């Protein structure tokens, strides 16, 4: 969503949007390997109003992931606090002593003995939250280059499928969707 460090990571969605829409302002981020819906502001007012909705946890976010192994339960709530793993940045890790609150609801969409498809609904927005939570459950996201297994997948199987926000001008609910390409 934003430029990374180094010339090879300079190409990103924000840079491309600024070519066509120079006033584009960042509202939130997605991990570099995550696909799907993002929202940008075209005015400072819109950017501030939308960013506040993210900060206040008023945005409903829904992701789809393919994870390793067969998930046997139908749904659940993951409540595992997260903290930066300073020795292995950008990795995050579960830490019950100093970690920040991180909550994720999940729902099984389908599964077989090799993999499962989950709907993930983060209630907080910590860095790598969904990736660490899936790994902590013993079902890392397929193709995850940091928390997953060595994989034959050409990409990380995590997709931001839906965002629901209140329009910054009129306050009406707005829903943005992008079906997962996997």
Question: Where are each of the predicted segments found?
Answer:
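RNA pseudouridine synthases
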Residues: 1-182
């Amino acid at each position: 969503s934003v430029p990374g460090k180094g010339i090879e990571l300079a190409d990103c969605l924000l840079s491309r949007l600024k070519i066509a829409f120079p006033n584009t302002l960042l509202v939130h981020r997605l991990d570099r390997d995550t696909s799907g819906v993002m929202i940008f502001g075209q005015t400072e007012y819109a950017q501030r109003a939308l960013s506040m909705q993210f900060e206040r946890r008023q945005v409903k976010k829904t992701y789809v992931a393919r994870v390793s192994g067969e998930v046997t339960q139908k749904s659940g709530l993951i409540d595992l606090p997260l903290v930066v793993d300073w020795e292995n940045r950008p990795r995050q890790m579960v830490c019950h002593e100093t970690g920040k609150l991180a909550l994720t609801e999940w729902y099984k969409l389908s599964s077989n003995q090799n993999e499962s498809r989950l709907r993930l609904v983060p209630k907080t927005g910590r860095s790598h939250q969904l990736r660490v939570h899936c790994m902590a459950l013993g079902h890392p996201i397929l193709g995850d280059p940091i928390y997953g297994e060595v994989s034959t997948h050409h990409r990380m199987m995590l997709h931001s499928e839906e965002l629901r926000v209140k329009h910054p001008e009129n306050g009406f609910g707005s829903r943005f969707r992008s079906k997962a390409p996997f």
